[in-house]
Design a protein with these regions (language model features):
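Hydrophobic alpha/beta core scaffold segments
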Residues: 2-393
Length: 393
């Protein structure tokens, strides 16, 4: 990706419309550095994807001082997607200029205590307000960030779907590296936990919301015969202890199961005519399997095999460029995709493809698309230049 260093320690990528920049999270004033790198532009919305190594409270409070005329939203990550592809220990800023974008925020303060109908009503009201603000703009999407340890993604996306209408939604579950202890969101200077934020965005720029994974189902199936759905725990598969049976199906010793195993041998469930990934997070001390997304007794799990990750990603990016390359792709990429890339020693190649195609965003604990919460997937929005764009900066 074309990039240049600004008058600070931050690096700005160089799309024509959406502004993006990144900085090492340990510099003295990362938010100010990011602002300088983004340039003197009137932003309606600024997104911050923040390494868990950063001081999140300082980032949040500083963000409303520096970007005081903008809506500022963000979250902690399981890694960042910046100008060079995969990154750790950085902060990525994505600025949406007011000349081409309008945004409103829908905030869910407590994922354990919200009224679904009120949420739906607020989504509809927000969309109507954006339509009144810029009635001549034709394109809309919703971007969701949610606490990645809340185990509430499935319920929230199902509830939000009732208020979407024709407007697509995508998003990602906030991360904490590979520690899995605490994740945070940022909403206009406040730090939130067990919460979610939806950015409702209307734009003059054509957009395409997409979902991509490189997995194909095999004929090997397993049935969940014992589970605690609220905790996303499976204790029995095929009437056998869960971890032991999963290992047997793979031809492995249960003691060998680790994050690399789960990334290389995911399971999928069939919903309608599509398969969706249900990734395993870890093996509990008692041999239960902990999942990243919804699981229940009676669910049929199908073992999946990966296609060539590099070639598949190239093809997906090429498909998004038919008719013209995107200005920017805002993306949520599952942590397990990065783990797989590292394991197969192709992380550099994947990073090169992401950078070449101007993909920015973060590595997640899960991904959302419309009413679905999924795993081991890349979701995002490709943003294209309008035919008669007013360039910024």
């Amino acid at each position: 990706m074309d990039q240049f260093a600004g008058p600070s320690q931050a690096v700005r990528c160089a799309p024509e419309i959406v502004r993006t920049a990144n900085v090492v999270c340990t510099v003295a004033d990362p938010v100010q550095d990011l602002s300088r790198a983004l340039g003197d532009v009137d932003f309606d919305l600024v997104l911050l994807f923040v390494s868990p190594q950063a001081d999140i409270a300082q980032i949040a409070s500083r963000s409303i001082e520096v970007f005081n005329d903008s809506l500022v939203l963000g979250c902690t990550t399981a890694g960042e997607l910046n100008c060079d592809g995969y990154s750790d220990g950085s902060i990525v800023a994505v600025g949406f200029p007011r000349a081409q974008f309008r945004a409103r925020m829908l905030q869910v303060d407590d994922l354990g205590d919200y009224d679904a109908q009120t949420l739906i009503d607020r989504m509809i009201q927000g969309r109507n307000a954006l339509m009144r603000d810029v009635p001549d703009w034709d394109y809309e999407f919703n971007f969701l960030m949610i606490d990645g340890l809340s185990r509430c993604e499935d319920k929230l996306t199902a509830d939000l779907a009732l208020g979407l209408g024709p407007v697509p939604l995508f998003g990602g579950s906030a991360g904490d590296g590979e520690t899995f202890e605490t994740t945070f969101l940022i909403a206009n200077g406040k730090v939130l936990r067990n919460a979610a934020i939806v950015a409702q965005i209307r734009t003059i720029c054509p957009i395409k919301v997409f979902k991509s994974d490189h997995l194909i189902p095999t004929e090997q199936r397993m049935v969940v015969t014992g589970a605690y759905p609220e905790q996303r725990l499976v204790y029995e598969i095929n009437a056998e202890p869960a971890a032991r049976e999963y290992a047997r199906v793979l031809g492995k010793d249960p003691e060998q199961l680790d994050t690399f195993t789960f990334a290389a041998h995911p399971v999928v469930v069939r919903i309608g005519d599509q398969h969706h990934v249900r990734s395993i997070q870890k093996v509990a001390e008692n041999g239960d399997l902990c999942f990243f997304s919804a699981i229940d007794e009676g669910l049929v799990l199908t073992l999946a095999e990966p296609l060539d990750m590099v070639e598949h990603l190239k093809q997906e990016m090429q498909a998004l460029s038919v008719g013209g390359a995107p200005d920017t792709i805002l993306a949520c990429d599952c942590l397990l995709r990065k783990v797989e890339a590292e394991q197969k020693q192709i992380k550099g190649q994947i990073s090169d493809i992401l950078a070449k195609n101007r993909v920015v965003g973060f590595s997640t604990y899960g991904e959302q698309l419309n009413s679905m919460h999924v795993n081991q997937t890349l979701t995002g929005v490709a943003i294209y230049p309008p035919e008669h764009s007013t360039k910024t900066g």
